[in-house]
């Protein structure tokens, strides 16, 4: 993690502009072709949810602007963000939030996430003040066409919130809607486009 020198930061003017906005957050929703991911997890007997969480995390960390954070009034560039996933408890309508680093490949991450989820007995199992997270969730019961998230009113909140819905058939391909909610002080449409391109390319390469 390194502190950003705002006097020479290429984003300083935009950061100050959006810092004056009372609600600098926005959300976009787009379609993702998950045909190859669906095939891959079926062949490898992996969780689609955890596998997508792995790929989403990789795509987030590939775009520098997603890794900016505010700490103690200063702007910092994080080394990486860590996925924090909502996960339904087996046989229950209640969920808990599973947080773990993205290590190894997809299969290793899926196994680690499954083991941690099974062992976790509380809603949270991490430092709630940690702002290097990615909030990840899924609504597999319906197609997602838009999403907003609960939050405290804090313009310094820089945690990306990423949610996707149920996949379905579209012209012989499996696609789903994905919502990404971000802070405009750091992230513009250009950066969301880079995230999408990386995610789709990684899925297509499976």
List the predicted regions and their residue ranges.
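Hydrophobic "lid/gating" helix adjacent to the active-site nucleophile
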Residues: 46-83
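Short, charged, low-complexity patches
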Residues: 45, 49, 106, 188-192, ...
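Flexible, Gly/Pro-enriched loop and linker segments at secondary-structure and domain junctions
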Residues: 1-29, 124, 132-138, 143-175
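Acyl/amide activation-and-transfer machinery of modular secondary-metabolite enzymes
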Residues: 21-39, 80-104, 175-181
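Active-site-proximal acidic secondary-structure segment that organizes catalysis
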Residues: 156-206
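Short amphipathic C-terminal alpha-helix that caps PH/PH-like domains
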Residues: 56, 110-117, 195-203
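Aromatic-residue-lined binding/catalytic grooves and analogous aromatic/hydrophobic interfacial grooves
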Residues: 3-4, 30, 40-44, 59
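Helical lid/core segments from catalytic subdomains that handle acyl or acyl-like groups
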Residues: 89-144
